[in-house]
Amino acid sequence: SRMDKYKSCHFSYFMRYGLQAEPRKPAGFTAPEYGTFVHYVLEHVLRDEMFRQTVLPGFADPVAGAEGRRRLRELTRAAVDRYVEEELGGLEHQTERFRYLFRRLLRSVQAVVDNVAEELAASQFRPISFELGFGSGQDLPPVELTVDGVTISVTGFVDRVDGWVHDGRLYLRVVDYKTGKKSFDLTEVWNGLGLQMLLYLFALEARGPDYYGQPVDGAGVLYLPARDAVVKGSRAMTDEAWRKQLDRELTRSGLVLDDPAVLSAMEHDALTEPHYLPLRVNRSGDISGSIASAAQLGRLGNYVDKLLRQISHEL
């Protein structure tokens, strides 16, 4: 995040991290607070054993999945209640407007949770790490490089890491929850922006075997929109129509490994009718979109390392 700030505007970087200047905090539930809220709910729901054992099995089935959806709502409500008590100290002392706005958010949060559950129910990839830290005293050491005789440490957190084991190798994808309109763009990467997820993926390829105890391959990176998506429609819009439009707002972006086995493991219908992955399939069955071969990912890793050294030298 700091690298993005530096590359986009040196002065903004100096104001924020040199002078520690911050904008005045408005009253209410701000976008960053909403992002923290969604992170909290998703992590607590996906970590829960009930989610793995009773929600996901048969979740995609319209009939058998009904019980799973009911349990998912219970898990979401429990996570929301915990957040309210732990982070907000309850709602009793909040203004009536704050409570009203917070209640409005609950529908969107449940829709995001439902969307993630539906994706995982149609996938063999499973969450294996949450808030995975790179840095001193964290899960993994920082990414370090020496430039001009000075060692630079890059630290941070991965929102979620999903894994799938195939032929004795662990395929990893990095998932980043985004509360804004951010999407993955290779043009930005070329200009030194949006390196965060790729940096984490390549670091996991290097350090993952020791951490996870088996050979590791990078399977890709995905931005998951976790914002309070605004759905435009009439008051007569049905819940089903509202959900379909919201699902479009929650479309993922990113870059995934161009390997049929990996793509099918990420999403069962990836090679025919992808719904969650940033792919397109034409009538001939040819796949296009945000895909890269293992060799292309390797070259991209070398380019990211070059950019890191350039940024470190400039700093």
Protein language model annotation of sequence segments:
Residues 1-315:
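Structural signature of nuclease core domains in nucleic-acid processing machines
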